[in-house]
């Protein structure tokens, strides 16, 4: 009560410490004692559907087996679907996205060539010998008399030097048996579809040999026209190679007005800042409008024929090389501003006396590289040097690859492609076997044995201009007189053959809408995880935490297996009584390892009599189990034991 003095604690036993933890209390880290216990715990507590049925039906073996089989089949189906999803992801599929855009468009570059290789007056002396031998060859093979041509006039001027190497020849082909003749023509690799003179069974060609003349072959053609043109072209390249290495300014420069009478873009006249000049070995003088070096960037803000490039061209052929160029007109190509013009690959010809209107539509393609596609962004990883020093394109790479092979195998550069510094163009006066090497290399290139088409990958970003052309006669019969009169007075030039002397070209956008095609990954990591989660929920109706439970089960299985193996290993190899089949296990335990409660009290060994209140059974240590078994005693102890027995006792 209040006011009472607190009771003083009397003498008594001292308070003991906190009780030691019992086995039932949960430890910080513990594991199940058996697989069965672990499995029952997992099935009773997991959130995966169907697992608890394996425990609830344990008293009905048939249901247990049914649910176990169903659970395993469901598990297998789910992981089969997982394999399908991972296979789809690692195949790196792409989706094509098509967008339609509308904006002002940058006008592309337009390259146009005369279709007229270097004129007679520029390289007349170099071509006389070639023309004479070609004339004689045509007469021998086809009885063609060109006495009225310019070549005949040149031949009467002076005697020429030694004959050219690699003469053109007529080569007979052995006739097959009559029964197999139809089969040969049907399945032969020869160019039997080409026209043949008098239907003779021969071929036209010229012989090419290697450096030491140990290997030779004939470059042959079933068409005489093709053979003559190719043979003339081969020698023309040699002549041109000598001039290209020592080019005079008069040969490289040409007046724009000699080829292009009028030029307008968006109704404004062109000037010298809008074009650049280059030479093509076969197409002569070429001009590129609106290339990357132009000072003014041409833009199209309106579609239609009046909002593009309009050119009036001179297409007369009075000074053409007839044995090299068999067509008249002009050649045009549309390409990107920072790409070179490959007139052989993508150009097309314009017809004289015709107005050609070309409408364009732009299309941009953006591909995915890396694992999603075999394309390159800038060609830096392509093992081919860009000899054009321009933007990477597949054609740039392919031509550079062939030129590298040409320099490596033949020791000289092909005149149609750029050459590295310090390398000469091929000329049989310096490289007498380059023709043999070139045609062999060309055959390997066509069949991709050089690997150029494999090395040169597509660019990831490409701009394509789709062209559609329409044609009409120009000028008309009623207007041609005043048109030709104006052109002649304006350009101080007399057009001899009016209809075949001019051509008109219009290039424009037919619409400002352009299509962009871009690739994107069809299956991203987010999509993959979503699909995996959907499959997991479909087959087990669980979530990510259920996956963690499965991982925990696997870890527990591994730990329990490890502990069981460790226990078995210790019992087999670390047991102290291992030598006596386990009978010496307790007997061999040292006294120091026994608990203190099993050790005798120190007073037990004192000289004073023992306290009768203390039971000997409680104070004595437990006997060693090994001593309970029979084994011989020491001799001294045996005698003492015998003397202690009373007489007559057993």
From Swiss-Prot:
Originally identified and characterized by its inhibition by the diuretic drug amiloride. GO terms for cellular component: acrosomal vesicle; apical plasma membrane; ciliary membrane; cytoplasm; cytosol; external side of plasma membrane; extracellular exosome; motile cilium. Residues 1-65, 565-650 are cytoplasmic. GO terms for biological process: cellular response to acidic pH; cellular response to aldosterone; intracellular sodium ion homeostasis; multicellular organismal-level water homeostasis; sodium ion homeostasis; sodium ion import across plasma membrane; sodium ion transmembrane transport. The record marks 158-159, 184-185 as: Cleavage by Furin. Expressed in kidney and lung (at protein level). The chain crosses the membrane at residues 66-86, 544-564. A motif (PY motif) lies at residues 621-625. Heterotrimer; containing an alpha/SCNN1A, a beta/SCNN1B and a gamma/SCNN1G subunit. Interacts with WWP1 (via WW domains). Interacts with WWP2 (via WW domains); inhibits the channel. Interacts with BPIFA1; the interaction is indirect via SCNN1B and inhibits the proteolytic processing of SCNN1A and SCNN1G and the activation of ENaC. Interacts with the full-length immature form of PCSK9 (pro-PCSK9). This is Epithelial sodium channel subunit alpha. It comes from Bos taurus (Bovine). The lineage of its organism: Eukaryota, Metazoa, Chordata, Craniata, Vertebrata. The gene is SCNN1A.
């Amino acid at each position: 009560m209040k006011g009472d003095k607190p009771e003083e604690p009397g003498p008594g036993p001292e308070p003991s410490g906190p009780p030691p933890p019992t086995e039932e209390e949960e430890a910080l880290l513990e594991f199940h004692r058996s697989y069965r216990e672990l499995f029952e715990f997992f099935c009773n507590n997991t959130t995966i559907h169907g697992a608890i049925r394996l425990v609830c039906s344990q008293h009905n073996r048939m249901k247990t087996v049914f649910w176990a089989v169903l659970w395993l089949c469901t598990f297998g189906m789910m992981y089969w679907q997982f394999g399908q999803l991972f296979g789809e992801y690692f195949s790196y599929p792409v989706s094509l996205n098509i967008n339609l855009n509308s904006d002002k468009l940058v006008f592309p570059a337009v390259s146009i060539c005369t279709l007229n290789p270097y004129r007679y007056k520029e390289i007349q002396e170099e071509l006389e010998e070639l023309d004479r031998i070609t004339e004689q060859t045509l007469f021998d093979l086809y009885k063609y008399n060109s006495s009225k041509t310019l070549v005949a006039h040149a031949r009467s001027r002076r005697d020429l030097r030694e004959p050219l190497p690699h003469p053109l020849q007529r080569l007979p082909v052995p006739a097959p048996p009559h029964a197999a003749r139809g089969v040969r023509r049907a399945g032969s690799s020869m160019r039997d579809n080409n026209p043949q003179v008098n239907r003779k069974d021969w071929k036209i060609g010229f012989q090419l040999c290697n450096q030491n003349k140990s290997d030779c072959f004939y470059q042959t053609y079933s068409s005489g026209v093709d053979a003559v043109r190719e043979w003339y072209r081969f020698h023309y390249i040699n002549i041109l190679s000598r001039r290209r290495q020592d080019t005079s300014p008069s040969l490289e420069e040409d007046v724009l007005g000699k080829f292009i009478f009028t030029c307008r873009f968006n109704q404004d006249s062109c000037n010298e800042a809008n074009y650049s000049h280059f030479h093509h070995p076969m197409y002569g003088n070429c001009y590129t409008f609106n290339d990357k070096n132009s000072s003014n960037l041409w833009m199209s803000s309106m579609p239609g024929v009046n909002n593009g490039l309009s050119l009036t061209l001179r297409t007369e052929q009075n000074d053409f090389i007839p044995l090299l160029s068999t067509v008249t007109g002009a050649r045009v190509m549309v390409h990107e501003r920072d790409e070179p013009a490959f007139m052989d690959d993508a150009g097309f010809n314009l017809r004289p006396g015709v107005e050609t209107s070309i409408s364009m539509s732009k299309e941009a393609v953006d591909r995915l590289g890396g694992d999603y596609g075999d394309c390159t962004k800038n060609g830096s990883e392509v093992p081919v040097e860009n000899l054009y020093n321009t933007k990477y394109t597949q054609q740039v790479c392919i031509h550079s690859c062939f030129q590298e092979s040409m320099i490596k195998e033949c020791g000289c550069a092909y005149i149609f492609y750029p050459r590295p510094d310090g390398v000469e163009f091929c000329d049989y006066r310096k490289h007498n076997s380059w023709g043999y090497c070139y045609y062999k290399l060309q055959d390997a290139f066509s069949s991709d044995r050089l690997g150029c088409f494999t090395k040169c990958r597509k660019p990831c970003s490409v701009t394509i201009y789709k062209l559609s052309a329409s044609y009409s006669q120009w000028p008309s019969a009623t207007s041609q007189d005043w048109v030709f009169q104006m052109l002649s007075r304006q350009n101080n030039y007399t057009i001899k053959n009016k209809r075949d002397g001019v051509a008109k070209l219009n290039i424009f956008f037919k619409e400002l809408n352009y299509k962009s095609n871009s690739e994107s990954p069809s299956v991203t990591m987010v999509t993959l995880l979503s699909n995996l989660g959907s499959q997991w929920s479909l087959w087990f109706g669980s979530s990510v935490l259920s996956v963690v439970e499965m991982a925990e089960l696997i870890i527990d299985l591994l730990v329990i297996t490890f502990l069981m193996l460790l226990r078995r290993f210790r019992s087999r190899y670390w047991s102290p009584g291992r030598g006596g089949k386990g009978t010496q296990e307790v007997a061999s335990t040292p006294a120091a390892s026994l608990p203190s409660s099993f050790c005798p009290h120190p007073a037990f060994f004192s000289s004073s009599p023992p306290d009768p209140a203390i039971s000997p059974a409680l104070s004595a240590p437990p006997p060693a189990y090994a001593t309970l078994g029979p084994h011989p005693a020491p001799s001294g102890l045996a005698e003492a034991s015998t003397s202690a027995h009373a007489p007559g006792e057993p």
